[in-house]
Amino acid sequence: MKSFYQENVFNDIDFGLIKSYVFKHIESSSDFNYTKIYGRYWNTIDFNDDINNLLIKTARSGFDVDDLEIVYTQCVKYQIKDGVTPSLGNHIDDFYATHTLNIIIDSTLDWPLTVGEVDFPSLTNSAVFLKGDEDFHSRPKYPSKNENDYVIAIFVNFAPANSEIIKKSNRFKSLPKEVREAMRLKMTPNDVNLY
């Protein structure tokens, strides 16, 4: 298994900046929509350069890969809604990112990410440095029936700077904001729970 877990990934000041940005993003997003596939709200999030640079530095150091760049970052909030319970079936990621930081921003419960046979806790300011393209991962049965419980996380997806997906990602990011937003509204998550 190439994935690993780390608690207290960021110092208090840096984590506070990330957490504040995520909460403002969730509050102000018109497209933070709920998908019944996973039982979560989700969309993509564009951090400012300071936070992006911090995330890149953390990934490069943790994975020991010095040319990782961000492909995209997903913001999620797992929560029961209208009787739909969060779930994540066992799968390998089938997109072009090669490394993912799965960072817990806030949580009212511990709903671990299982990688291989190892459960990694959902603690605030912890991260799974995930080789999701190689390591099978899932989550166990959701541990609550309370609709007020939740897990807020970001999935920062990386690939080497010279990869084709980074070139495509950069072209997408260069499109006008309204075009990017219109395209994002049409994105549908892949249902890994079918596997």
What are these regions (language model features)?
Residues 1-63:
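Non-heme Fe(II)/2-oxoglutarate
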Residues 29-33, 99-104, 179-184:
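Glycine-rich loops and low-complexity Gly/Arg-rich segments
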Residues 64-74:
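A short coil-to-beta-strand element that immediately follows conserved catalytic motifs
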Residues 69, 78-140, 147-175:
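Catalytic core of non-heme Fe(II) oxygenases with the double-stranded beta-helix
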Residues 174-195:
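Short, cationic low-complexity segments
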